[in-house]
Amino acid sequence: MENWVIRGAVPEDFEAVQALENLDFSAHAQARPDYFREGQVLYSRQEYEALLAHPCPIALVAEEAGAVAGLCFGFVTDHPGDAFCKPRRFALIQDLVTLPEYRGRGIATALLARAREQAVQAGAVSLELCAWAFNERALRLYEKAGLKVQYYRMEMDLRNG
């Protein structure tokens, strides 16, 4: 049985959100020290409040016993179209993070499902996100949730010949 609830994020969640973001960023920096800076705080209070004030935010937290256990942040936006792409409205998930002690309990799946509901209600035709290749656990979660690869972005390290 679930002891957690999914709710909208509020300004008072900032410290817990910042801790989750730092945890997530540290994992990225550890996996790709060549790419990510160490010790950087992803969200300032101003950035967090800007997300909450976005015209169509996805700003969700999972809470258990008064503590924030996970988050899902993003927004719904319109792409005007261009020479190649049709105009469309889509949801972009920027962050989906769960504290390690809460992983494997369905929290991230529930956060993603609620984000999907919000996206549909806002008229989005798709829900999109980016994931790093090293984050295999997240990739499995996304595939299980029904997300499919849209495109591949590849890199070649040019520093060593």
Give residue spans per PLM region:
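Conserved N-terminal entry element of GNAT/NAT acetyltransferase domains
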Residues: 1-12, 161
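Conserved GNAT-fold acetyl-CoA-binding loop/helix
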Residues: 25-48
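A short helix-loop-beta-strand connector motif used in the catalytic cores of GNAT acetyltransferases and
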Residues: 46-60, 92
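Conserved beta-strand in the GNAT
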Residues: 61, 67-76, 92, 97
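Conserved acetyl-CoA-binding loop-helix of GNAT-fold acetyltransferases
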Residues: 95-98, 104-117, 140, 144
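Conserved GNAT acetyl-CoA-binding A-motif
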Residues: 119-130
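Conserved acetyl-CoA-binding loop of GNAT-fold acetyltransferases
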Residues: 124, 143-152
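Conserved beta-strand-loop-alpha-helix junction that forms the acyl-donor binding cleft
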Residues: 128-138, 155-160
